[in-house]
């Protein structure tokens, strides 16, 4: 299943949207949306559990980043889809160590193009995520390894130093 991460991102977005509209928890909402194909794939389930767990555990911290970078907007005025795309992408950037931040941002933009109601949403999502990413990078709060490294030359340098 080549696109399982995109499918899972879309399912989690739908779950986040559902909990904003109904009185339910994220696990129940996401569980209703999982396909058998995802349930049968251990890598897909690992990614699902990691991403949904990160969103649940760090929602208030993630929302603080969004609020800080949407200074002219009250969180309640941000479209539900856009807000939840931002939450999901930030959870990936901050807590999914093997996914490069630029991949998370690009995926968020593509999902915004597919699910948001206006053409401006993808630009809004891109601008907010880019600003938050730059802050996180400056503050040294992005911790990636393996395929998630931001700069592979750093990985080579570290590998060369440890092999001496």
Curated annotation (Swiss-Prot):
Keyword Transport attributed: no
GO molecular function: RNA binding
Family of the protein in this entry: Belongs to the NusB family.
GO biological process, alphabetically ordered: DNA-templated transcription termination; transcription antitermination
Gene: nusB
Superkingdom of the organism of origin: Bacteria
InterPro entries xrefs: NusB-like_sf, NusB_fam, NusB_RsmB_TIM44
UniProt xrefs under SUPFAM superfamilies: NusB-like
One Gene Ontology term, aspect cellular component: cytosol
Annotated function: Involved in transcription antitermination. Required for transcription of ribosomal RNA (rRNA) genes. Binds specifically to the boxA antiterminator sequence of the ribosomal RNA (rrn) operons.
Pfam family, one: NusB
Source organism phylogeny: Bacteria, Pseudomonadati, Chlorobiota, Chlorobiia, Chlorobiales
Protein name: Transcription antitermination protein NusB
Keywords assigned: RNA-binding, Transcription, Transcription antitermination, Transcription regulation
């Amino acid at each position: 299943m080549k696109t399982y991460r995109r499918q899972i991102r879309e399912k989690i977005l739908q779950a986040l949207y559902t909990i904003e509209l109904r009185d339910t928890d994220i696990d129940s909402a996401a569980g209703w949306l999982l396909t058998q194909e995802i349930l049968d794939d251990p890598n897909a389930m690992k990614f699902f559990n990691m991403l949904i767990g990160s969103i649940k555990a760090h929602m208030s911290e993630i929302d603080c980043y969004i609020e800080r970078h949407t200074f002219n907007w009250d969180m309640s005025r941000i479209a539900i889809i856009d807000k939840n795309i931002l939450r999901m992408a930030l959870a990936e950037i901050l807590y999914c160590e093997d996914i490069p931040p630029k991949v998370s941002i690009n995926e968020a933009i593509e999902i915004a193009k597919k699910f948001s109601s206006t053409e401006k949403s993808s630009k809004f999502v891109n601008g907010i995520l880019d600003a938050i990413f730059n802050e996180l990078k400056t503050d040294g709060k992005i911790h990636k390894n393996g395929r998630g490294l931001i700069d592979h030359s750093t990985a080579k340098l570290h590998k060369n130093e440890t092999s001496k």
